[in-house]
């Protein structure tokens, strides 16, 4: 049976701990899974959060969305695959471990601690953070298989990566190539395009104009501009656009005449920037410059430049390129194929060497600045060029520049040999598969994704690091390669292992090999340096592993099949793949969403997921990014501690559309907490009365109950609510769902329905009208708790356990089915009519306030003036509600006689008609009523024509003095403010009832407790109160009201000139 609530007040902390304990002790999570094990499959793929530290509000938002979707699908009957995942390799962890160990370079890693120890430290760091993050996710009420997460560091996961890369190799989509790529000199590794997107930050760099002497021409120069002076030692050409107009400009430099070649369109800007005047002496097309030779300005400092000049025809010449623009610079571009993507491409076309005199740490390996870090060489190079007379002007520029996504070091462009996935060959396939098979939420993100795919280059997947999936590429001394696809294949091909520099040949038998491997290397571990020890033999050639590891984005890119253990475990893959739904933050559109599709199309020729949703970032209240430096970070634990898990969860799904950025607001959090408090109060009220009357919905004969219009209305609303919430979730328009729930709880259920039925709940005995209200409330909770359970799992569980479980026999709210709307209960017309009734009540209350008549004092009559048929029907059908809520003896539809005065609106007439304003104003004074009735008129006054509208008039209405009016959308409410003795007596009785009830509350009396009331008051009050003594006794549960000295618990109420005493009857 229903009991009185354990907590009278909503205390999230206590309540949620209690529910956590219940779930744990009753093993509810496992029971929920067991219940749905035969349902249709739903593969929810958890995008693995990176284990570099504790979760933040963005991570929490992400997991809350995921948990809500999982709970929703489970209630729909799906057997949801809900394995959490963790991204555990990569640079971010290496950087953290390096900092902890005080290491600064790769050399220090190898010499001070050793690769094996470093990798062990990375593993420990990752596993420790995994444990911390798991507890934080559990704290949010997230239900996933926490005992069985997928981890990118597990052998079977790494083997999935090897399988995928082997598939790429077999398709001709994996190859080694020299390319110019972003390079992090601190981490000493290449970075892929998608790692750099979003990592451009403002920084100041040099901005210099330099002149290259034209060979064989005295005082004639090619004028170039650059922000990377450090790349000038590697300059091999100057690029011009074939179709642009170029000019030779004569300039006067302190009495010395020089000739500069640059783009015609940039002459004024460049000369103005440099601060010199010039005269154009010759004009020509860019293509005419092709082949023009210049003298390298650092030839002596970098002797290799002389070798290149002699060996390559196009070195130190003007070449043609379409990438040259007129937006900045001089129209002539300093070209270094070893340090620029476009430079590299045009260099290939002209047969230029790829020259990059810079090592992995970003230091020069030769020439004048050997051993100097390139960015530190900038000022030295500028000063040197000044001394040599080649510097025209040096300045500074603030621009967006790419930084390492983890260590934040400015990147450099550098040519290196790397391994690439040839995504360029499958781009069109990715776009086609995506457009045909993937549903995007919101839909416009699909276009952004497709454009990203079109703009992407080949995927550089090699990293010159340690903590990552080792590239499964073995290479012979003569350059032949073989890609290993599994642990089994590696063992089969292995002929020897190398341990501490010693070669150990392996026996031929597979089982014997395994024994030796385990004895010498330990159990299978597909990380470095374990796999580095293997020497394999293919085509009669011994091969050793390429030392690189795989881009960490590849780890998560294969998650949809690697998390299922494929290809080691084919059964799960065949049952579940592809994923039905994924959801991640906005930055993942060009990262994880992309890396998955690229890897999947390469491996399986199709996409790995069927539906994808994107959410925004969490910002502070002002819209700023949360950061330590700004001191505006709010931790998830802080929100849970202050407001509770349910409040936090609901707020994050209510505050904004999921694809927009969420500006976190404590006011918003408090607003949601108040909503849940309102829900709790409705529950406490319902459960308290139901428990007193031993209400049992199973014993109710529904067909015998006479439901009132408000009962039918709330049942109609709650059934429509099912559609609204479900539609909001299905379309990922989550705010539609949460705001519909919020409005239903606050406006429909609490502020309206409960307000309408309170008096019915007070009636004693088995009153059928009260029973109808109980049953309606119970049915509303039956639906509402199911709808809210995925959003607020704790409060719904607590309420369910008391008012639902005794009658359903089902152990948890989360084991219930998602509700289906009862169309027979939906009455759209009644809902429309009730909406008007609420508006009329609001307007009527405002009118009473104008008249300064408290709601407790009844009024004689209220008139509703309207032309709307729905309003008329509503007033007729729901008249009893209006009478009760507006405390009126009579509510009727009718018209009120009133006098209308129309005056000119001089604020409008004067400025518009100027000199004719007097004529117009006179006409309005005489004929204004005609204009008011028609809305607009064309008139002729003294031979002049005017167009007049209601904007030109001010309308004053004079209604009878005993009425006060207020408009509502659909009409107007008139309240008759005449107060008779009878009305005064009734109002005073209500005033006293309210105060007695307040005193009962202060004494914490039970609803059923009986009292005796004693009242000391004026003679006039006593006479008025005696007219309504029965009403006072009934409403206050008093067995007697006596007019004498107040006794017991006594309170003086000056505003009604009375002392009231109450005594509980034992």
From Swiss-Prot:
GO BP term (any one): isoleucyl-tRNA aminoacylation
Keyword hit for Hydrolase: no
Family matches, as Pfam families: Anticodon_1, DUF5915, tRNA-synt_1
Compartments reported by the entry: Cytoplasm
EC number: 6.1.1.5
Motif placement: 'HIGH' region: 49-59
Chief location of this protein within or outside the cell: cytoplasm
Enzymatic reactions: tRNA(Ile) + L-isoleucine + ATP = L-isoleucyl-tRNA(Ile) + AMP + diphosphate
Motif 'KMSKS' region: positions: 625-629
GO cellular component term, pick one: cytoplasm
Entries under InterPro entries matching the protein: aa-tRNA-synth_I_CS, aa-tRNA-synth_Ia, Anticodon_Ile_ABEc, Ile-tRNA-ligase, Ile-tRNA-ligase_type2, M/V/L/I-tRNA-synth_anticd-bd, Rossmann-like_a/b/a_fold, tRNAsynth_Ia_anticodon-bd
A GO molecular-function descriptor: zinc ion binding
Keywords from the UniProt entry: Aminoacyl-tRNA synthetase, ATP-binding, Cytoplasm, Ligase, Metal-binding, Nucleotide-binding, Protein biosynthesis, Zinc
UniProt: ATP binding residues: 628
Highest taxon, organism lineage: Archaea
Cofactor requirement: Zn(2+)
Domain notes: IleRS has two distinct active sites: one for aminoacylation and one for editing. The misactivated valine is translocated from the active site to the editing site, which sterically excludes the correctly activated isoleucine. The single editing site contains two valyl binding pockets, one specific for each substrate (Val-AMP or Val-tRNA(Ile)).
Membership in a protein family: Belongs to the class-I aminoacyl-tRNA synthetase family. IleS type 2 subfamily.
Subunit structure: Monomer.
The protein's role, per its UniProt record: Catalyzes the attachment of isoleucine to tRNA(Ile). As IleRS can inadvertently accommodate and process structurally similar amino acids such as valine, to avoid such errors it has two additional distinct tRNA(Ile)-dependent editing activities. One activity is designated as 'pretransfer' editing and involves the hydrolysis of activated Val-AMP. The other activity is designated 'posttransfer' editing and involves deacylation of mischarged Val-tRNA(Ile).
Protein name: Isoleucine--tRNA ligase
Gene that encodes it: ileS
């Amino acid at each position: 049976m229903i009991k009185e609530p354990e907590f009278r007040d909503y205390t999230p902390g206590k309540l949620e701990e209690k529910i956590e304990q219940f779930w744990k002790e009753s093993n509810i999570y496992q029971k929920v899974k067991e219940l749905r094990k035969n349902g249709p499959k739903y593969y929810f793929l958890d995008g693995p959060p990176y284990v570099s530290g504790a979760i933040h509000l963005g991570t929490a938002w992400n997991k809350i969305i995921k948990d809500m979707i999982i709970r929703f699908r489970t209630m729909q009957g799906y057997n949801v695959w809900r394995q959490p995942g963790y991204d555990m390799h990569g640079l971010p962890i290496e950087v953290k471990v390096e900092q902890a160990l005080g290491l600064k370079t790769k050399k220090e890693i190898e010499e001070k601690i050793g690769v094996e120890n470093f990798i062990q430290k990375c593993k420990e760091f990752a596993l420790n953070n995994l444990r911390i993050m798991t507890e934080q996710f559990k704290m949010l009420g997230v239900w996933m298989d926490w005992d069985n997460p997928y981890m990118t560091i597990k052998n079977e996961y790494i083997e999935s990566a090897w399988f995928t890369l082997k598939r790429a190799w077999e398709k001709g989509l994996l190859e080694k190539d020299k390319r110019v790529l972003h390079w992090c000199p601190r981490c000493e590794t290449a970075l892929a395009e998608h790692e750099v997107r979003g990592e451009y930050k403002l920084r100041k760099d040099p901005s210099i104009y330099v002149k290259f002497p034209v060979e064989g021409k005295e005082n004639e120069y090619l004028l170039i501009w650059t922000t990377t002076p450090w790349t000038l030692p590697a300059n091999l050409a100057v690029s011009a656009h074939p179709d642009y107009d170029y000019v030779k400009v004569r300039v006067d430099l302190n009495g010395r005449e020089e000739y500069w070649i640059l783009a015609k369109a940039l002459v004024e800007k460049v000369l103005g920037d440099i601060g010199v005047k010039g005269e154009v002496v010759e004009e020509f097309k860019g293509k005419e410059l092709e082949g023009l030779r210049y003298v390298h300005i650092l030839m002596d400092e970098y002797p290799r430049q002389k070798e290149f000049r002699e060996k390559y025809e196009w070195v130190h010449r003007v070449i043609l390129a379409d990438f040259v623009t007129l937006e900045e610079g001089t129209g002539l571009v300093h070209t270094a194929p070893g340090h620029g993507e476009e430079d590299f491409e045009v260099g290939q076309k002209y047969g230029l060497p790829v020259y990059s005199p810079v090592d992995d740490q970003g230091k020069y390996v030769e020439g004048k600045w050997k051993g100097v870090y390139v960015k530190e060489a900038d000022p030295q190079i500028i000063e040197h060029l000044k001394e040599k007379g080649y510097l025209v002007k040096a300045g500074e520029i603030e621009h967006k520049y790419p930084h390492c996504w983890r260590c934040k070091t400015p990147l450099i462009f550098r040519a290196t040999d790397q391994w690439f996935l040839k995504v360029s060959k499958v781009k069109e396939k990715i776009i086609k598969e995506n457009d045909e098979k993937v549903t995007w939420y919101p839909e416009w993100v699909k276009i952004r994704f497709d454009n990203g795919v079109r703009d992407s280059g080949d995927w550089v997947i090699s990293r010159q690091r340690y903590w990552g999936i080792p590239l499964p590429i073995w290479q012979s001394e003569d350059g032949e390669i073989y890609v290993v696809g599994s642990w089994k294949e590696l063992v089969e091909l292995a002929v020897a292992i190398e341990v501490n520099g010693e070669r150990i040949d392996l026996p031929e038998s597979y089982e014997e090999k395994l024994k030796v491997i385990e004895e010498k290397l330990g159990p299978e571990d597909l990380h470095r340096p374990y796999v580095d020890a293997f020497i394999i033999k293919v085509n009669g050639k011994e091969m050793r592993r390429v030392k690189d590891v795989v881009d960490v984005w590849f780890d998560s890119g294969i998650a949809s099949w690697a998390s299922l253990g494929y290809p080691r475990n084919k059964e799960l893959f065949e049952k579940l793949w592809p994923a039905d739904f994924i959801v991640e933050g906005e930055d993942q559109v060009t990262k994880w969403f992309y890396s998955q599709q690229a890897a999947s199309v390469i491996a399986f020729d199709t996409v790995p997921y069927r539906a994808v949703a994107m959410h925004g970032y969490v910002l502070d209240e002002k819209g700023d990014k949360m950061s330590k430096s700004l001191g505006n970070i709010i931790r998830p634990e802080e929100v849970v501690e202050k407001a509770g898990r349910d409040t936090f969860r609901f707020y994050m799904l209510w505050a904004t559309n999921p694809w927009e950025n969420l500006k976190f607001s404590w006011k918003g959090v408090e607003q949601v907490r108040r909503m849940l408090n309102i829900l709790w109060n409705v529950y406490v009220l319902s459960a308290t009365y139901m428990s007193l009357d031993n209400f049992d919905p199973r014993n109710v004969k529904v067909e015998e109950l006479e439901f009132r219009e408000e009962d039918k209305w709330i049942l109609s609303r709650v059934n429509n609510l099912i559609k609204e919430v479900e539609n909001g979730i299905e379309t990922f328009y989550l705010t539609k769902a949460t705001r519909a729930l919020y409005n239903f709880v606050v406006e429909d259920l609490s502020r309206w329905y409960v307000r309408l039925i309170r008096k019915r709940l007070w009636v004693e005995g088995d009153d059928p009208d009260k029973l109808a209200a109980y049953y309606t409330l119970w049915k509303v909770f039956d639906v509402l708790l199911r709808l809210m359970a995925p959003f607020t799992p704790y409060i719904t569980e607590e309420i369910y356990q008391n008012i639902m479980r005794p009658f359903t026999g089902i152990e948890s709210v989360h084991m219930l089915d998602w509700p289906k709307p009862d169309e027979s209960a939906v009455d759209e017309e009644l809902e429309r009519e009730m909406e008007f009734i609420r508006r009329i009540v609001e307007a009527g209350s405002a009118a009473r306030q104008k008249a300064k008549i408290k709601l407790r004092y009844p009024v004689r009559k209220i008139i509703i003036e309207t032309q709307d048929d729905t309003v008329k029907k509503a007033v007729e059908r729901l008249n009893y509600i209006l009478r009760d809520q507006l405390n009126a003896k009579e509510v009727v539809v009718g018209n009120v006689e009133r006098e209308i005065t129309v005056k000119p609106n001089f604020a409008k007439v004067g400025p518009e008609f100027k000199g004719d304003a007097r004529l117009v104003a006179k006409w309005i004074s005489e004929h204004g009523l005609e204009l008011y009735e028609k809305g607009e008129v064309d008139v002729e006054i003294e031979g002049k024509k005017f167009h007049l509208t209601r904007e030109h008039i001010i309308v004053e209405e004079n209604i009878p003095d005993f009425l006060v009016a207020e408009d509502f959308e659909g009409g107007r409410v008139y309240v008759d403010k005449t107060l008779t003795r009878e009305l005064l007596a009734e109002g005073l009785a209500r005033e006293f009832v309210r105060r007695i009830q307040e005193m009962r509350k202060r004494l914490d009396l039970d609803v059923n407790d009986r009292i005796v009331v004693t009242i000391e008051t004026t003679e006039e009050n006593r006479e008025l109160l005696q007219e309504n003594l029965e009403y006072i006794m009934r409403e206050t549960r008093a067995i007697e009201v006596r007019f004498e000295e107040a006794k017991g618990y006594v309170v003086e109420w000056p505003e009604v000139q009375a002392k009231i005493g109450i005594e509980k009857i034992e």
